[in-house]
Amino acid sequence: MLAHARERVPAARFVRQDITTWRPEAPLDLVFANAALQFLPDHAAQLPRLFGFVAEDGILAVQMPITLHEASHAAMRLTAAEGPWARRLAPIVRAQPVIAAFEDYYEWLAAAGAKVEVWTTTYVHALDGVEGVVDWFAGSGLRPFLDPLEETEREAFLARDRTAIAESYGPRADGKVLLPYPRLFIVARR
């Protein structure tokens, strides 16, 4: 990902670091996190910490998927819990990121001195059948479940996941499946 970013924006400096310990060299005009912070524990501490790096008149801008309770993610957890891989995947099921209520983010950042805007939006993606839904999550939500498995187990896991997905997302007349994808947006200004 960073190599691709360097190619696209060669004048910028990209550094791979752990966001939980990262500290900028100087206050920043913009701290932008797109679909990254949901993987962090302890949002009550981490978001105010990140806001602390924002310069005067600067912004912390965050977008996080809030999909834990969506049928797609319930299917992943069910598939993980019921297959022959259940014991190996149990820690992953327990470690699924939990996004707090939007009111919590407001309170945490307002207490840190931010002027906060927070809202949710649900995007609806028209995907090519159940396979389109599985493909959509193959590089994101399914990764923690698939990575520990052997190739044949991955195939079996995906087959079971497809079955669970099909029970929740029926195709439309044109064969498309409508996938709701809720997101949380936060803009915190100093």
Explain the meaning of each model-derived region:
Residues 2-13, 77, 106, 110, ...:
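Class I S-adenosyl-L-methionine
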Residues 3, 16-18, 35-39, 50-55, ...:
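Membrane-interface segments of envelope glycosyltransferases acting on lipid-linked substrates or membrane lipids
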Residues 6, 10, 41, 55, ...:
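Short conserved AdoMet
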Residues 25, 96-190:
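Conserved Class I S-adenosyl-L-methionine
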Residues 29-44, 66:
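A short SAM/SAH-binding and catalytic strip from SAM-dependent methyltransferases
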Residues 1-24, 30, 44-45, 49:
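Class I SAM-dependent methyltransferase SAM/SAH-binding core
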Residues 22, 38, 67, 140:
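Active-site beta-alpha loop architecture of Rossmann-like, nucleotide-cofactor-dependent enzymes
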Residues 44-45, 51, 55-128, 150:
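Conserved catalytic/acceptor-binding region of the Class I
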